[in-house]
């Protein structure tokens, strides 16, 4: 079987201050929404932009750093992998979530800089 590559690299802004949360099995993590922006000019030369939102999860020491230092508007560089996980909602219905599991993060500053 061929070896695959699953790597995500993003640079963007944090939507809101992250908080520690727990999965149903008790595992703690931090989840944040990260915005990346694409800018271009249309055929008439008018500036256009689009914001893409990415769901990111961080575990362990990386989660602790995120909770302690990141705030709304913080700019970060992160690397991770795309993962889809199955979970059950409060009614017992199976759901799936696709997110980026970060394994490296560098703080770049805030949106105020």
Task: Show where each model-derived region lies.
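Single-stranded nucleic acid-binding surfaces, predominantly the OB-fold ssDNA-binding core
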Residues: 1-113
């Amino acid at each position: 079987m061929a070896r695959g590559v699953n790597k995500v690299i993003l640079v963007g802004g944090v939507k809101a201050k992250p908080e520690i949360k727990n999965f149903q099995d008790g595992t703690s993590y931090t989840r944040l929404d990260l915005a990346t922006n694409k800018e271009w000019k249309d055929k008439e030369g008018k500036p256009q932009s689009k914001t893409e939102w990415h769901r990111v999860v961080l575990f362990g020491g990386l989660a602790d750093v995120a909770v302690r230092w990141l705030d709304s508007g913080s700019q970060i560089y992160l690397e991770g992998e795309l993962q889809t996980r199955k979970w059950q909602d409060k009614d017992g219905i199976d759901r799936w979530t696709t997110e980026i599991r970060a394994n490296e993060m560098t703080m770049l500053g805030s949106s105020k800089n």
